[in-house]
Regions:
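Short active-site neighborhood of thiol/selenol oxidoreductases, capturing the structured segment around
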Residues: 23-28, 207-219
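Bacterial N-terminal signal peptides
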Residues: 1-9
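Residues at alpha-helix boundaries and the short loops/turns that link adjacent helices
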Residues: 90, 218-221
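Short, intrinsically disordered, charge-balanced linker/junction segments flanking boundaries
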Residues: 220-229
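Flexible coil/turn and secondary-structure edge motifs
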Residues: 15-205, 225-226
Length: 229
């Protein structure tokens, strides 16, 4: 009996572990997090996008503190970022990063347009070495494209994530709550040469709580069959 219980527990653990290996996170900063969050949530394959703060030291992670005048040019200030949770089976990390780079101006230092200060810095906080390698490759490629169009050097900071702090509730889904809210476009208009496979997708139905969404697994899932009936 003990052996059967142990074997069953191991199978459950293995199935649970396997079912989440395609889910990853990346924390991205590209200026004001309101518009950035909206952009990620529109991508097919993005499970969640949460506005927050990261990469600060000696500064409390809340909006009031990071926007103090004394912290405007503080190199240790937190950056406005978005924690993006995505399904690798539906959107590649490369496509997600292409969207990130094309959606803002990474050549601006500590600002995006009229949003000026270290809180608006361009920053990528990766979760693993695989992400880091792809980021390095894409930044090199994008720099070449930007240079051809007369832009300067990319200022994006790249480092491993230490801690992400979720922003206050009123910042979450801000543009959805305030359709006419502040959402400037600071993108350069420079696009990657290859076709971008990222397409906007209406994920709003997933947040209504009235539908069951079944994502087909790569392995046999006896429970999934029940939902098809």
């Amino acid at each position: 009996i003990t052996l059967l219980i142990s074997t069953f527990s191991l199978l459950i653990f293995a199935e649970k572990n396997q079912s989440t290996t395609h889910i990853e996170k990346i924390v991205l900063g590209s200026g004001c997090f309101w518009g950035a969050e909206k952009g990620y949530e529109a991508l097919n394959g993005v499970i969640d996008a949460v506005s927050g703060y990261a990469d600060g030291k000696g500064v409390r992670a809340n909006y009031r503190e990071i926007t103090r005048f004394t912290n405007k040019f503080n190199p240790n200030n937190h950056a406005e970022v978005v924690e993006v949770t995505y399904n690798k089976n539906l959107i590649s990390f490369e496509d997600l990063m292409i969207h990130y780079l094309e959606s803002h101006d990474p050549t601006q230092l500590n600002r995006q347009g009229n949003d000026i200060g270290t809180q608006y810095r361009s920053i990528i906080l990766f979760s693993n070495t695989s992400q880091q390698e792809k980021i390095t490759q894409l930044l090199t490629e994008y720099q070449s494209l930007l240079s051809k169009e007369g832009y300067g050097a990319i200022q994006t900071v790249v480092k491993p994530l230490t801690k992400f702090y979720e922003a206050e509730n009123y910042h979450q889904d801000y543009i959805k709550k305030n359709p006419n809210g502040y959402c400037p476009d600071h993108s350069t208009g420079v696009r990657f040469a290859r076709t971008n496979s990222v397409k906007d997708f209406d994920n709003s139905i997933l947040k209504e709580g009235k539908n069951i969404v079944v994502i087909e697994p790569e392995w046999y899932c006896p429970y999934c069959d029940k939902f098809r009936e």
